[in-house]
């Protein structure tokens, strides 16, 4: 389980994964040994949300409340804070390089703290709010790829930041929805970025990897390279679009099309081809 700094607490907390077809809630707690203990979980049909965005506040907040309540019953515990994972919010990754002068030529801890806090006023896309800020490697004068410049000599120290931001409107609406469930919004995370942390190795993120999270109503993507998040985005098409296309082409119900897709469908061309067509008998009158 990936836990952000805002989740680093001894109190139980919830993680709500918002999909187009279902909501999933996990309740966890950090143990005295610094492990993450899973206490409870629950799923519920998604309502009032489409393609990662809230379309009906009342229906969505009700569905969230039912999902969290079921997870609380499963865990036999009550939570006050929830962290959201969603493909929505029109995510954007921006990169900034911050540079400071080194007055005494030797880099101190104060210099490192100074450059780390210098990113608080960096610009974001219009109408966006920052949800993640990741520092990269340092540069000291013309020397690049420095992991820890403490004690080194130089005149200027630079540090690149990768910032992930989402629409302020989406953020505010998610916060409003959980507040209606008497919960506090701890943080919001992009689904593909969280999938990268869960699925990719350190080598994957260092060498360069594109991860595609194919959901029901959206397809989320994230790119890591040299250990840094380079891109995150969401396409408002997913598995439900494929299901509807099958239903239209074969004149069958959505449930029949979903079953056919699950049994016969494949994204690998080596498994299916024109030489091995799928047969389907239409049984309805």
Protein language model features and the residues they cover:
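Glycine-rich phosphate-binding loop of actin/hexokinase-like ATP-binding domains
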Residues: 207-245
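Short beta-strand scaffold segments in enzyme catalytic cores
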Residues: 23-27, 220-223
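Long, well-ordered mid-to-C-terminal structural blocks that present hydrophobic/aromatic surfaces
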Residues: 247-251
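Nucleotide/phosphate-binding catalytic cleft detector across ATP-hydrolyzing
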Residues: 1-20, 26-210, 228-230, 239, ...
């Amino acid at each position: 389980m990936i836990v952000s700094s805002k989740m680093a607490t001894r109190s139980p907390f919830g993680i709500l994964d918002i999909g187009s077809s279902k909501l999933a809630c996990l309740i966890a707690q950090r143990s005295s040994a610094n492990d993450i203990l899973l206490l409870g979980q629950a799923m519920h049909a998604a309502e009032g949300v489409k393609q990662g965005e809230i379309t009906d506040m009342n229906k969505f907040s009700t569905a969230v409340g039912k999902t969290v309540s079921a997870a609380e019953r499963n865990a036999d515990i009550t939570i006050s804070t929830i962290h959201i994972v969603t493909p929505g919010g029109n995510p954007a990754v921006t990169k900034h390089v911050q540079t400071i002068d080194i007055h005494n030529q030797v880099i101190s801890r104060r210099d490192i703290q100074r450059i780390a806090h210098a990113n608080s006023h960096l610009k974001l896309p219009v109408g966006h709010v920052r949800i993640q800020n990741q520092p990269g490697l340092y540069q000291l004068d013309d020397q690049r790829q420095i992991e820890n410049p403490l004690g080194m000599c130089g005149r200027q120290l630079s540090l690149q930041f990768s910032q992930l931001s989402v629409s302020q409107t989406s953020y505010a609406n998610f916060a409003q929805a959980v507040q209606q469930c008497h919960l506090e919004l701890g943080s919001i995370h992009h689904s593909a970025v969280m999938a990268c942390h869960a699925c990719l190795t350190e080598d994957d993120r260092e060498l360069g990897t594109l991860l595609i999270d194919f959901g029901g109503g959206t397809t989320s993507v994230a790119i890591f390279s040299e250990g840094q998040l380079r891109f995150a985005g969401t396409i408002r098409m997913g598995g439900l679009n494929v299901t509807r296309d099958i239903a239209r082409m074969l004149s069958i119900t959505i449930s029949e099309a979903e079953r056919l897709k699950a049994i016969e469908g494949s994204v690998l061309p080596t498994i299916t081809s024109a030489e091995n067509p799928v047969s389907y008998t239409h049984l309805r009158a």
